[in-house]
């Protein structure tokens, strides 16, 4: 067996005394063992992040730009290695894994460009009597050491969405990766080490939850950026004290399909949005509301599209639905489906488990209080519900503790803007599924879906602080 995978602190790889297994979620076989940090390791990582922050804030933007471009290039050069690792570690279908690597390359490339254009502002202060000679200049400065806690489902790009803007803004960052997928984050550490940044600019430290909570409460971190479940995110926020917090949490994304929509297109997009990567994304399509006049037609087309999606071995390029991340996830989803059926829901397709893979499952006759409707499924299950009036669909979609993204398929611009005004979400996507995300757009939600925004430019704003300079400009003598 290969040596246990070390973690990265202060530009050096360290072995820990405690090892944890990382298993292939499709085969269940051991993939690798990873060293996890002790309290002493955590203290070293925190201090390394603090020390690096002092150096990082002095780096000129051109140096940050070139370092981020090197990271993007390193990712691209090793793209096949990263993709294979994500397929083995996260069970991510090969085509999705390749797509994620390309997105991560773009995330670092975008961050490199944004490093050159962190904005400032000249503010006239002569609006009130007595301030005639005053001028203000506002610039954004690095916030300081950042703590990033990342999920399993995008083990590269969601790490990139914390690391890239942190470095672009002139900060250092400590990443605590998901216990199911630490290998991808550690491989990214190899690439970052070659970019010429100060030691400790990026530290990567797998650890247990108890130690992670100690990191969260440590006042030396000035910002926590967390992506994960709502329950954990809000619990951590309560422990953060004075530090700034960005939370990207869960969702149970809804879609509205109107009679004037391109029904074939909507069905095709909803199938991909609901079942890609086995529905293990926070913006996976979970609830579809279809106008009653087209409900039968849409459902027929949707079921045909879903039935074409191949489930199974994620290393097969034709696979769309791979394994769930672990047996607990599989059992939970089976339980929720069974509970919904016992409460009156009907299974239109799927509903069975094949080892670690759940069949694509479509349910009808669901109610808003069923777990499959009101909680985050995070699995390959989609509900289809008819409605009579557009306002009824808006109300139903809002009947959720979450508010991340929503899709509306219609050609009526008035209805699009009505949805934009009234849907309680972070983004409304017209004639597109809520699963869509561009890596430079502001991304985040409301209600239990989080606070703050990701997307490189938005994240840089969170990872910097405004600083004001006031000039009292008196006229030179003799003028």
Where are these predicted regions, by residue range?
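Short, well-ordered beta-strand elements within core beta-sheets of diverse protein domains
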Residues: 30-37, 52-58, 147-148, 255-258, ...
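Residue-level signal for inorganic ion chemistry
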Residues: 28, 64, 86, 108, ...
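Proline-centered turn/helix-capping motifs that create local helix->coil transitions or kinks
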Residues: 109-124, 307-311, 347-352
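Rossmann-like NAD(P) dinucleotide-binding subdomain of oxidoreductase/dehydrogenase enzymes
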Residues: 123-265, 387
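Conserved C-terminal structural/oligomerization subdomain of aldehyde/semialdehyde dehydrogenase
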Residues: 27-33, 197, 256, 310, ...
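Hydrophobic face of amphipathic alpha-helices that form TPR/SEL1-like repeat modules
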Residues: 1-25, 463
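Glycine-rich loop-to-alpha-helix module at the N-terminal edge of alpha/beta enzyme cores
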Residues: 31-119
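ALDH superfamily catalytic-core signature
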Residues: 231-367, 430, 476-479
């Amino acid at each position: 067996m290969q040596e246990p995978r070390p973690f990265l602190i202060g530009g050096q790889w360290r072995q820990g005394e405690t090892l944890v297994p990382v298993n292939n979620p499709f085969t269940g076989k051991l993939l690798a063992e990873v060293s996890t940090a002790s309290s002493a390791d955590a203290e070293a990582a925190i201090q390394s992040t603090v020390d690096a922050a002092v150096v990082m804030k002095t780096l000129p933007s051109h140096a940050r730009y070139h370092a981020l471009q090197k990271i993007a290039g390193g990712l691209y050069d090793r793209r096949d290695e990263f993709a294979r690792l994500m397929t083995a570690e996260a069970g991510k279908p090969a085509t999705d894994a390749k797509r994620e690597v390309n997105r991560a390359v773009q995330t670092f490339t975008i961050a490199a460009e944004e490093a050159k254009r962190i904005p400032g502002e000249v503010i006239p202060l002569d609006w009130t009597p007595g301030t005639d000679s005053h001028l203000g200049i506002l610039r954004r400065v690095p916030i300081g050491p950042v703590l990033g806690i990342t999920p399993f489902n995008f083990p590269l790009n969601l790490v990139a969405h914390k690391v890239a803007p942190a470095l672009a803004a002139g900060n250092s960052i400590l990443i605590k990766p998901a216990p199911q997928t630490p290998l991808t984050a550690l491989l990214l550490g190899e690439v970052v080490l070659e970019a010429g940044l100060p030691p400790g600019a990026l530290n990567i430290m797998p650890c247990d939850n108890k130690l992670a909570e100690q990191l969260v409460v440590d006042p030396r971190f000035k910002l926590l950026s967390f992506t994960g479940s709502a329950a954990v995110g809000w619990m951590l926020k309560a422990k953060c004290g004075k530090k700034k917090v960005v939370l990207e949490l869960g969702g149970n994304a809804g879609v509205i399909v109107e009679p004037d929509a391109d029904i074939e297109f909507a069905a095709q997009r909803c199938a991909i949005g609901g079942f890609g990567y086995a529905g293990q994304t926070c913006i996976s399509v979970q609830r579809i509301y279809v106008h009653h006049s087209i409900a039968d037609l849409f459902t027929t087309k949707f079921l045909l599209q879903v039935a074409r999606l191949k489930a199974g071995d994620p290393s097969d390029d034709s696979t769309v639905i791979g394994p769930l991340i672990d047996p607990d996830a599989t059992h939970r989803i089976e339980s929720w489906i069974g509970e919904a059926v016992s409460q009156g829901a009907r299974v239109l397709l799927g509903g069975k488990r094949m080892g670690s893979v759940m069949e694509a499952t479509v349910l009808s006759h669901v109610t808003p209080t069923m777990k499959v409707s009101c909680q985050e499924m995070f699995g390959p299950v989609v509900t289809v519900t008819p409605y009579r009036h557009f306002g009824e669909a808006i109300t139903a979609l809002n009947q959720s503790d979450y508010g991340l993204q929503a899709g509306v398929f219609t050609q009526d611009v008035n209805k699009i803007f009505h949805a934009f005004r009234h849907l309680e979400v972070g983004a409304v996507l017209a004639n597109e599924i809520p699963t869509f995300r561009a890596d430079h757009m502001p991304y985040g939600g409301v209600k239990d879906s989080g606070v703050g925004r990701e997307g490189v430019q938005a994240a840089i704003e969170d990872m910097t602080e405004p600083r004001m300079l006031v000039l009292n400009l008196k006229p030179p003598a003799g003028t």
